[in-house]
Amino acid sequence: MNIFGVGLPEVTVILILALLIFGPKKLPELGKQLGKTLKSLKKASNEFQNEIDQVMKEEDKDESPKSIESNQSNEINQEKIDSENSNN
C-alpha cells in the first residue's frame, strides 16, 4: 500500500497520532471532512484538466487550417526560388 508516497507504517503512525491528538470522538468527523476536502480537490483538478484539454483541442482545430495554408505557401515560395535559381 502506497498512498502519496506514504507506506503502511507511516499511515499507521499518522493514524495513532491523530487518535491521540483529536480523540476517538472527533476522529470520524475529521475523517469525513478530510474525505470531502479530497473529493472537492479532485473534482476541481479534473475540471481544470478538462478545460485545458478543451482549449488544446480548440487550438489544434484553429491551427490546422493555418498550418496547411502555411505549408502550401512555403511550397509555392520554394518552387519560385527553385525556378529562379534554375533560370540563372
From Swiss-Prot:
<protein>
    <recommendedName>
        <fullName>Sec-independent protein translocase protein TatA</fullName>
    </recommendedName>
</protein>
<keyword id="KW-0811">Translocation</keyword>
<keyword id="KW-0812">Transmembrane</keyword>
<feature type="compositionally biased region" description="Polar residues">
    <location>
        <begin position="67"/>
        <end position="76"/>
    </location>
</feature>
<keyword id="KW-0653">Protein transport</keyword>
<dbReference type="GO" id="GO:0033281">
    <property type="term" value="C:TAT protein transport complex"/>
</dbReference>
<keyword id="KW-1133">Transmembrane helix</keyword>
<keyword id="KW-1003">Cell membrane</keyword>
<comment type="subunit">
    <text>Forms a complex with TatC.</text>
</comment>
<dbReference type="GO" id="GO:0043953">
    <property type="term" value="P:protein transport by the Tat complex"/>
</dbReference>
<dbReference type="InterPro" id="IPR003369">
    <property type="entry name" value="TatA/B/E"/>
</dbReference>
<dbReference type="GO" id="GO:0008320">
    <property type="term" value="F:protein transmembrane transporter activity"/>
</dbReference>
<keyword id="KW-0813">Transport</keyword>
<keyword id="KW-0997">Cell inner membrane</keyword>
<feature type="compositionally biased region" description="Basic and acidic residues">
    <location>
        <begin position="77"/>
        <end position="88"/>
    </location>
</feature>
<dbReference type="InterPro" id="IPR006312">
    <property type="entry name" value="TatA/E"/>
</dbReference>
<feature type="region of interest" description="Disordered">
    <location>
        <begin position="56"/>
        <end position="88"/>
    </location>
</feature>
<feature type="transmembrane region" description="Helical">
    <location>
        <begin position="3"/>
        <end position="23"/>
    </location>
</feature>
<comment type="similarity">
    <text>Belongs to the TatA/E family.</text>
</comment>
<keyword id="KW-0472">Membrane</keyword>
<feature type="compositionally biased region" description="Basic and acidic residues">
    <location>
        <begin position="56"/>
        <end position="66"/>
    </location>
</feature>
<comment type="function">
    <text>Part of the twin-arginine translocation (Tat) system that transports large folded proteins containing a characteristic twin-arginine motif in their signal peptide across membranes. TatA could form the protein-conducting channel of the Tat system.</text>
</comment>
<dbReference type="Pfam" id="PF02416">
    <property type="entry name" value="TatA_B_E"/>
</dbReference>
